[in-house]
Amino acid sequence: MNGTLAPVTRHLDLPGGRIAFDDTGHGEGAPVVLLPGMLDSRAAYRHLRPLLTAAGRRVITMDLRGFGESSVVWDDYSPAAIAGDVLALLDHLGIDRAVLAGNSYTGASVVRAAGDAPGRVAGIVLLDAFVENVPPGALQRLALGAMGALLVHSPAFWGLYHRRMAYPGPKPADHEEYVAGLVAAMRVPGRKTATRGYVRGDSAPTGWTAAVRCPALVVMGSKDPDFGKPELVADRQAAALNARKVMIEGAGHYPMADHPRATADALLAFLADLA
């Protein structure tokens, strides 16, 4: 499938709203479900998705509550709620077991889904996720609160983050167009409510990893600006999940976009070992 073509959007109706997704519909091994980070869309995987499908995998990408082509206003935007959406999507598609991958905020969602429904999850992948972070101190909480307020009231700040921080190395050829789309999406009526729901949620829950029994892979960009010491965070997550760890040299917070080939190689090796 040509990665430059937009996949066909399908929808799952749930209590409270509608979730958008796409599905290649065929492939070898357990299907792979890719979840974007907060305030993003499933197009975050536009460069990784074709590499996985070219390798023969069935790939499903899903928009989160409030963003992409999903319904905008929900009563809950938490990682746990998103975990429930993923499991509902598996039911909807008649999938018994899948590999779940989550970036950033939704790393917690795939961990929660694996703990809640171990029989449904063949493996999990954390892509620069916030799971099992060291709890922030008082000053850090103040800084995070200020940043959250900026995101809610100033979509341009989200654009600044993507243009100046999130991609410390190479940027995708379509980067500027993509970032402009992210900023425009935040200005859609109702998105302020959705943004507030995400920035006030617990994106880094601790303790959830204890319930995970499936194989896990931790992928981390070596230059992720969201973490002072990215490899230390990856080590903590890998230890909590008894997981394989892969550092993507030079990658930022979105390795599937700035280093898609290296990210695909890490995922495909993990998937091969699950067979």
Where on the chain are the PLM-derived regions?
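Alpha/beta-hydrolase fold catalytic core
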Residues: 1-32, 54-57, 95-96, 122, ...
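Conserved HGGG/HGGXW glycine-rich cap/lid loop of the alpha/beta-hydrolase fold
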Residues: 24-69
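Active-site loop/oxyanion-hole signature of alpha/beta-hydrolase fold enzymes
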Residues: 46, 54, 61-101, 105
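Hydrolases whose catalytic domains are alpha/beta-hydrolase-1, hotdog thioesterase
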Residues: 109-113
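Flexible "cap/lid" loop of the alpha/beta hydrolase fold
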Residues: 115, 122-152
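Conserved alpha/beta-hydrolase catalytic His-Asp/Glu region
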Residues: 135-137, 153-211
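Conserved loop-alpha-helix segment in the C-terminal half of the alpha/beta-hydrolase fold
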Residues: 217-251
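Catalytic active-site module of serine/aspartate enzymes centered on a nucleophile-bearing elbow/loop
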Residues: 241-275
